[in-house]
Amino acid sequence: NMVKLIYYRNFEVDMDFKRHIAKKLNIEGIGEDELVSMLALPPNTEMGDFALPCFKFAKIFRKSPALIAEEIAKSVPADEFVSEVSAVNGYVNFKIDRDFWAKETLSRVLSEKERYGSSDEGTGKTVCIDYSSVNIAKPFHIGHLSTTVLGSSLYKLHKFLGYTPVGINHLGDYGTQFGKLISAFKRWGSREDVEKGGLRALNELYVRFHREAESNEALNDEARSYFKKIEEGDKESVALFEWFKELTLKDVSKIYKLLDVHFDSWAGESFYNDKMGPVIEELEEKGLLKESEGAKIVDLEAYGMPPCIILRSDGASLYATRDIAAALYRKQTYDFYKCLYVVAYQQNLHFKQLFKVLELMGKEWSKDLVHVAY
């Protein structure tokens, strides 16, 4: 009913009632603050709203918890707050008057307004939240919606509870696809058409490249060459890449504005280009890096997982390498209390491998990394 909807459950209201119950209890040698901390929620709400376990009192009073609970229940009278007190299996159960609870809760809602339910539990704690992670030069699609909305909700909830959230859009802005896009643009595109068409025009160029490459393998070689130029800092190639990035962010920002979604960091895959060397060095120093069929891996067989590939046989880094570098950077930069990755459940294995590799590297904080799967 409506009363049940209203009274369940506000932390501050709970604390007020716990304090009231503790004041009513007169248990020798047990202070009010300790009683407040002992009062818990019963497993079944039909039994009561708060329960006091009496097992720790058995040694003090040399009686069974059940007998102690009965004696306490008899000694505590009901009042305008507490409508019923009962003893069950060593617990003292307290039922709060529903009308009073509803009035108390509504009073707080009216006085605190939009701050109702907030707390300062997260004061001084930073929580990194990795969500949305759009791909440069590709449109924002339905697949991005879940991670974007869930991540934004977690951001707002943590902020409401006093944490300092850091919203991170880990952009997909690295890979040979950008060499393909430069090749396609230089062959069939124009600045005027792309400025006018935005992401749609870029996507059309990308699709055309793949269509043409089916019968012309030389295009893939050309794309690899352009991507290498980006990596080497070639002015023209980097300028085109940055322009594609700018057009993408301009386009997706309209969607983020509609959804009321915000980010504090847009550091994507390319941001970690110069941060992977130290990761590989550390893995080697700690004896974690092994060679397998020309590739560099971390063997996770002992943990029931396939190997985590760090470097391909051609020396190229992989997704896992960048995510290790990103986790290290985020810990160093934000000293997070938790780091949440709001990513589809299909990536479960990737995150299990990532967290395990960081643990093997001796990063005690790896336990604070959480994959929020959906």
Each language-model region and where it sits:
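NTP-dependent nucleotidyl-transfer catalytic core
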Residues: 7-11, 30-60, 64-374
